[in-house]
Amino acid sequence: MNILIIGNGGREHALAWKVAQSPLADKVFVAPGNAGTALEHKVENVNISATDIPALVKFAQDKQIGLTIVGPEAPLVIGVVDAFREAGLKIFGPAKAAAQLEGSKAFTKDFLARHKIPTAEYQNFTEVEPALTYLREKGTPIVVKADGLAAGKGVIVAMTLQEAEDAVRDMLSGNAFGEAGSRVVIEEFLDGEEASFIVMVDGKNVEPMASSQDHKRVGENDTGLNTGGMGAYSPAPVITPEIHSRIMKEVIYPTVNGMAAEGNVYTGFLYAGLMIMPNGQPKVIEFNCRFGDPETQPIMLRLKSDLVELCLKACDGKLDEVISQWDLRASLGIVLAAEGYPKDYRKGDEISGLPKSAVKNEKVFLAGVAEQEGKLVTNGGRVLCVTALGESVFEAQQKALKLAEQIQWSGRFYRRDIGYRAVERELQK
């Protein structure tokens, strides 16, 4: 069958690479795709924006697309799934009403409270003065979040009152995130270890993907600004078998059942960004309605099952008929970013040193990369993600670092400590 993947990042390159391996996939189209997806076997880019829903629907009808997988959040929040379903097309992702779990942080916090799902204490604000009063009552450290979508950058972890007040003013009166910041959520700072827990949902059945841990801060030792993610590894040792079952019981099933009870049946990938507290309790920091980026890259390297089959079963409400199979090795991905990211960054620098041919257990997934006159040049903040499998997280990390060193362009940078928590655990054994 023909398959369509919507999006143009490193995550979509990883999804396209995995989908193309399926015997069920004759041809894989990526809209709009990037220079990485263009190079994959059986894969073709289509020049349609990820948010141009009428054009995507028409393309899917013209090419007789048997399955569509949505990569990024923006099309989900504006209703791409609803439009495809109305046209009788099979698509894996949540409908617009269910995608509010990512589209509005205030919606999510209120939903969690209604269903007694553990999360940080919080309040929502649309006016500056009441928000400032609340900040002064609660003290720091404290977290200020823009309500809507802000490409992973709308969260400020404020260590001083001044930082917190500036964030509130920037969002509510300074319009730092436009419409996304017209309402803010202020919540308590949770001190634990973060983990990404991604599952597939068919409305009622849930199939967990491998656990992972992302690294949000731009600098080593988790310093500097928040980003969309500077690297990730899988599995995350903080998620022990016991904590895994707690997450399913206390977070995932109550969320899926709660959404269904409220008339927003959830299908698609559901990504719970969690804080694992020192006592082992998982608390929800955020939900995303899609696979994470960069978590997808190391997770896809470990997935042994046919992703197309999993998605088709999920679309048909039959996820209980399949169990995903995973490589027991660890995988780790390091993002190589353009100078200046996550603020204003340079574009157009020529990239050299990319592997000429496929290497077993290693893969470079391209993201912000364009082709110009036969050369690959930087075209985004997060340019690519070097990913490797290893017998341990340390081994995967060392392989990925070696791969990263070979790839060059002017001003490129990356974190050399991705996976440090897991590596420390391994060294203590």
Swiss-Prot record:
Binds 1 Mg(2+) or Mn(2+) ion per subunit. The gene is purD. Pfam families: GARS_A, GARS_C, GARS_N. Its cofactor is Mg(2+); Mn(2+). It comes from Haemophilus influenzae (strain ATCC 51907 / DSM 11121 / KW20 / Rd). Pathway: Purine metabolism; IMP biosynthesis via de novo pathway; N(1)-(5-phospho-D-ribosyl)glycinamide from 5-phospho-alpha-D-ribose 1-diphosphate: step 2/2. GO terms for biological process: 'de novo' IMP biosynthetic process; purine nucleobase biosynthetic process. It is an enzyme of class 6 (ligase). This is Phosphoribosylamine--glycine ligase.
